[in-house]
């Protein structure tokens, strides 16, 4: 009988050590923000009822809580900077510049804020406009974001973040008009 009890205790200990703790929103933010910041390669696919086929772009991303810079390498060279108050576009080789103030394009601000905050791991800021449900543990996780404020609900259907450890790997943005953008951050 003692052998049976020891075997059961060992099995329970094995299960307890092998199962990681389910993450909370605050823990996921801490995990993501604890990651070293650097540039990341990305591949982004945009699907839309207004496009005859999906459009895929590739390049590098650099993110901070205040800015997301997307340097597109293909299919054409360009740079997008999403700042807190505006979006900037720079054409190939630095030629041609445009900026859009978010005060003049509030719908664009919603999309820019989501992208900027998600890639920076700023879940606390996202929680102001979204209900966030985290699934998984520190090894493999996902976060579902459902809009809850009128401004965001008008633009977005849902957001999904997927990752492993302290690394965001996939950002999926589904817009109300049927558009879907899937951004994969590559190792």
Label each region the model flagged.
Residues 1-4:
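N-terminal secretory signal peptides that target proteins for export/translocation
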Residues 6-18:
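Bacterial N-terminal signal peptides
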Residues 18-41, 46-52:
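N-terminal leader/targeting segments and the immediate start of mature chains
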Residues 42-44, 69-73, 89, 143-149, ...:
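Short beta-strand segments that buttress and anchor functional surface loops
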Residues 55-58, 75-76, 153-158:
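Short, surface-exposed coil-to-beta transition loops
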Residues 58-110, 181:
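An acidic-aromatic
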Residues 95-142:
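Flexible, surface-exposed loop/linker segments and immediately adjacent secondary-structure boundaries
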């Amino acid at each position: 009988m003692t052998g049976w009890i020891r075997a059961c205790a060992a099995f329970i200990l094995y299960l307890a050590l092998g199962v990681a703790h389910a993450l909370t929103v605050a823990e996921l933010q801490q995990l993501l923000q604890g990651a070293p910041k650097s540039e990341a390669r990305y591949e982004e696919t945009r699907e839309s009822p207004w496009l005859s086929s999906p459009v895929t772009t590739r390049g590098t991303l650099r993110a901070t809580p205040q800015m997301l810079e997307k340097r597109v390498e293909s299919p054409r060279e360009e740079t997008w900077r999403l700042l807190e108050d505006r979006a900037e576009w720079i054409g190939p080789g630095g030629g041609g510049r445009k900026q859009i103030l978010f005060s003049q394009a509030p719908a664009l601000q919603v999309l820019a804020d989501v992208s900027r905050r998600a890639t920076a791991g700023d879940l606390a800021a996202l929680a102001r406009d979204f209900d966030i449900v985290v699934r998984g543990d520190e090894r493999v996780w996902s976060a579902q974001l459902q809009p809850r404020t009128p401004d965001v609900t008008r633009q977005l259907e849902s957001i999904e973040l997927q990752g492993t450890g302290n690394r965001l790997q996939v950002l999926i943005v589904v817009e109300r008009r049927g558009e879907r953008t899937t951004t994969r951050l590559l190792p």
